[in-house]
């Protein structure tokens, strides 16, 4: 959201919706006149009921794109199908390496020399959607989970706005399971 403000994008954020009442993004939205809505998953008896309420809330704002950030719940297949090709996520690893949780810890344990973040379309399989772009950071001697996570987060803040901007400018599309960016980019991996 900050990148959109700083660069004066030809788009607007129609809402920030979170399942966590204390999410920082909600405060940022409120401070900037963007509707901020909580759909707390704990208020629902089933996952299907939560997903239906979440979808109803999202649909009330008619977004062209849904950009997940810090959303740590697995969505149901019907929910994902509803927004196919219009929902993206950022994941703190160079997918397909280290899907799921604890990515930085796992990268350090594996002894990799580079780590990073991936922006991908959301599909039914967690963290396996078509990759839009990635950002690499080096794993430095002496890194711990916190130092590596901080470096990856900075990269996330570079590549997520890039992918969103491609979408809002009509350059990014999902055709079947293939990411199409037109005109093509010279690079899809951003390096620190």
Residue positions per predicted region:
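Short beta->alpha connector loops at strand-helix junctions that form conserved
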Residues: 37-42, 90
């Amino acid at each position: 959201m900050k990148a959109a403000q700083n660069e004066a994008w030809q788009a607007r954020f129609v809402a920030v919706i979170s399942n966590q009442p204390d999410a920082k993004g909600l405060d940022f939205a409120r401070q900037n006149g963007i509707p901020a809505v909580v759909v707390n998953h704990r208020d629902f008896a089933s996952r299907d009921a939560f997903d239906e309420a979440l979808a109803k809330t999202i649909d009330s704002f008619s977004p062209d794109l849904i950009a997940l950030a810090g959303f740590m719940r697995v969505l149901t297949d019907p929910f994902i199908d509803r927004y196919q090709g219009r929902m993206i996520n950022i994941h703190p690893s160079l997918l397909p390496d280290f899907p799921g949780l604890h990515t930085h810890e796992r990268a350090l344990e594996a002894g990799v020399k580079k780590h990073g973040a991936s922006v991908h379309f959301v599909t039914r399989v967690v963290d396996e959607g078509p990759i839009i772009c990635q950002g690499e950071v080096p794993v430095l001697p002496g890194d711990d989970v916190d130092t590596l996570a901080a470096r990856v987060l900075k990269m996330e803040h570079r590549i997520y706005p890039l992918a969103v901007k491609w979408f809002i400018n009509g350059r990014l599309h999902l055709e079947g399971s293939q990411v199409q960016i037109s005109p093509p980019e010279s690079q899809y991996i951003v390096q620190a």
